[in-house]
């Protein structure tokens, strides 16, 4: 993979030469001082430009960054449409480096800078950015639940548990797995994250998809959670569901006690 300095210099060298590019920023994990550095980190870069169309209509300029072996352009896709503003080129290079390069109009600079605080300014040709921007991941910190959000989490978990049971009773294992993984599990992880917050504070992030969760919970809790990912049979699914419910009940009672919230009777 390209070393950090080599790839960034390649990006900045191109940006300095092209008058249409006025501002260049780096986003994501490479700007986050709380994330361990490794060779697998993407380069999330945004070019704020005077005109986007020339870059979109002629993609030859992308070769400046390396040999592209695969690319996605979300704005050009039908099955997986873009969910963020701008126009993006998500590239995997032949040395396995991944570069996510997004084009935004420079007129949208103020709006863009308000969208995410995890941004580092690499180039500002016109001095448009007056404030000193320091990247921070505070937008991704664990958030304290309100009484309403706590109850909503409990309600969603226990209500959809009945769907998992229905799927298992009908011998529709894919239906049951889908509801456990895509509804119950996110609420269980959310509740566990609140537990972490009550114990260690709400001043840090557990990472995308809770990837740092294991560093902040007891080994026994972590192993119980991991056991719920074994869903290869109906017996395994019943066991996973029961364990998820036991975990959720235990953790949500702790969270309710900490915040002095009423513990709902949804699991009666």
What are these regions (language model features)?
Residues 1-19, 27-38, 46-102:
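Metal-dependent nucleotidyltransferase catalytic core
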Residues 33, 108-110, 220:
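A broad, structure-centric signal for solvent-exposed, well-ordered loop/edge residues
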Residues 37-38, 113-115, 206:
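Short aromatic-enriched loop/helix-cap "lid" or pocket-rim segments at secondary-structure transitions
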Residues 38, 120, 211:
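Flexible, active-site-adjacent loop/turn segments at secondary-structure boundaries
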Residues 65-175, 180:
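Conserved NTP/Mg2+-binding pocket subregion across the NTase superfamily
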């Amino acid at each position: 993979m390209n070393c950090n300095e080599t790839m960034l210099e390649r990006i900045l060298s191109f940006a300095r030469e092209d008058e249409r590019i006025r501002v260049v920023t780096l986003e994501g994990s490479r700007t986050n001082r709380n994330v361990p550095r490794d060779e697998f980190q993407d380069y999330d870069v945004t070019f704020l430009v005077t005109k986007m169309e020339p870059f979109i209509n002629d993609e030859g300029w992308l070769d400046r960054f390396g040999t592209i072996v695969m690319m996605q352009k979300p704005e050009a896709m039908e099955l997986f449409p873009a969910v963020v503003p701008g126009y993006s080129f998500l590239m995997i290079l032949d040395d396995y480096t991944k570069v996510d390069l997004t084009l935004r109009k420079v007129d949208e600079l103020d709006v863009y800078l308000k969208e995410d605080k995890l941004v580092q300014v690499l180039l500002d040709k016109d001095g448009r950015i007056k404030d000193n921007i320091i990247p921070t991941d505070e937008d991704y910190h664990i958030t304290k639940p309100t009484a309403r959000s706590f109850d909503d989490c409990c309600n969603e978990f226990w209500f959809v548990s009945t769907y998992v049971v229905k799927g298992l009773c009908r011998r529709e294992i894919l239906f049951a797995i889908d509801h456990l993984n895509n509804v119950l599990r996110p609420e269980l992880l959310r509740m566990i994250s609140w537990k972490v917050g009550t114990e260690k504070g709400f001043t840090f992030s557990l990472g995308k998809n809770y990837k740092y969760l294991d560093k902040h919970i007891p080994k026994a809790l972590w192993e119980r959670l991991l056991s719920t990912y074994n869903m290869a049979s109906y017996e395994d699914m019943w066991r996973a569901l029961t364990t998820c419910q036991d975990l959720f009940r235990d953790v949500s009672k702790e969270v309710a006690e900490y915040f002095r919230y009423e513990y709902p009777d949804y699991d009666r």
